[in-house]
């Protein structure tokens, strides 16, 4: 594969800027979700099974222990980003967040902080806290789970917020100089390529620094799993994902960094689509598609030109 020559990928971007490989280490901060505990809603998003975020052992380790454990598993990197991934990693009092984030960045060889959260859980005090780390020289990314820009779909999947909420949070973050990475799902019920391209267009118009693309995973324990088991919902086919994600990449400005272009999961948690068991399947097909049809930005006549590392 030669994805770095076809897509402005986060790994390549980090290597160019830091002069060496930088690896993300995922953390479980013990946070909850306001869309489950009644603060915003109950039941959670219809695609979500929170147990899939982290293994049980990870949940019971300290931040320092989690980072040390994961760093030992990474052979090719000596610099790391601390990534608070599970649940809603800004859903706590600011003093609790400060303690968590500080524990992470104070560990050896941590050069940055990535915080995954919902657009409706990022008050000004949290943005200001993240800015403190940015101003100290850390690489800081606010990762917002948007999934889609279509309010009808957001309601259908029980997200508990609308696209306007995402726009407000993104604009406030970027006004402070924070980098925003938006998570988008391809294959949501009722959406096809046209809707996904519309989502991309609206995200780019709002302003964004990075994007994560993710095929819809139907996972055990989710509300969607019940629809799948009843035959009312199908997982997205690899061919359809490749076509839609490929066109989204081709319609993305070259300066936007792709943090991820596919995602995998394992059985028994994963019910469908089973091609997502293979972490390389989506990337191999996208590599082929983009080689045939054009690189990131080519549909805008602004093709991605790889920079010398």
Across the structure, where does each feature detected by a protein language model lie?
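Acidic (Asp/Glu)-rich catalytic clusters
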Residues: 72-76, 100-108, 128-139, 171-175
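Structural recognition of alpha->loop->beta junctions
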Residues: 45, 104-110, 198-212, 281-297
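Hydrophobic faces of well-ordered beta-strands that scaffold small-molecule active sites
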Residues: 23-27, 80-85, 113-115, 140-144, ...
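Core AdoMet radical
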Residues: 51-66, 70, 74-94, 109-122, ...
């Amino acid at each position: 594969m030669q994805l770095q020559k076809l897509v402005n990928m986060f790994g390549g971007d980090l290597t160019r800027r830091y002069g060496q490989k930088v690896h993300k280490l995922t953390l479980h901060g013990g946070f909850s979700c306001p869309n489950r505990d009644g603060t915003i809603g109950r039941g959670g998003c219809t695609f979500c099974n929170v147990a899939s975020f982290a293994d049980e052992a990870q949940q019971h380790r300290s931040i320092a222990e989690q980072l040390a454990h994961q760093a030992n598993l990474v052979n090719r990197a000596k610099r790391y980003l601390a990534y608070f991934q599970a649940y809603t990693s800004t859903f706590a009092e600011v003093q609790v967040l400060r303690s968590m984030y500080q524990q992470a960045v104070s560990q050896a060889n941590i050069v940055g902080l990535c915080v995954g959260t919902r657009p409706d859980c990022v008050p000004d005090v949290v943005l200001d806290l993240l800015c403190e780390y940015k101003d100290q020289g850390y690489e800081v990314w606010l990762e917002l789970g948007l999934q889609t820009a279509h309010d009808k779909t957001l309601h259908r999947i029980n997200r508990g917020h609308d696209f306007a909420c995402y726009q407000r949070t993104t604009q406030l973050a970027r006004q402070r100089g924070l980098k925003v990475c938006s998570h988008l799902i391809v294959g949501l019920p009722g959406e096809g390529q046209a809707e996904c391209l519309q989502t991309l267009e609206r995200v780019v118009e709002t302003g964004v620094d990075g994007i994560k693309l993710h095929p819809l995973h139907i996972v055990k324990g989710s509300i969607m799993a019940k629809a799948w088991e009843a035959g009312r919902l199908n997982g997205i086919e690899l061919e359809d994902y490749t076509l839609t994600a490929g066109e989204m990449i081709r319609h993305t400005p070259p300066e936007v960094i792709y943090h991820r272009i596919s995602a995998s999961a394992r059985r028994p948690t994963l019910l469908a689509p089973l091609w997502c068991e293979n972490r390389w399947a989506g990337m191999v097909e996208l590599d082929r598609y983009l080689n045939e049809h054009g690189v990131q930005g080519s549909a805008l006549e602004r093709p991605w030109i790889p920079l010398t590392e």
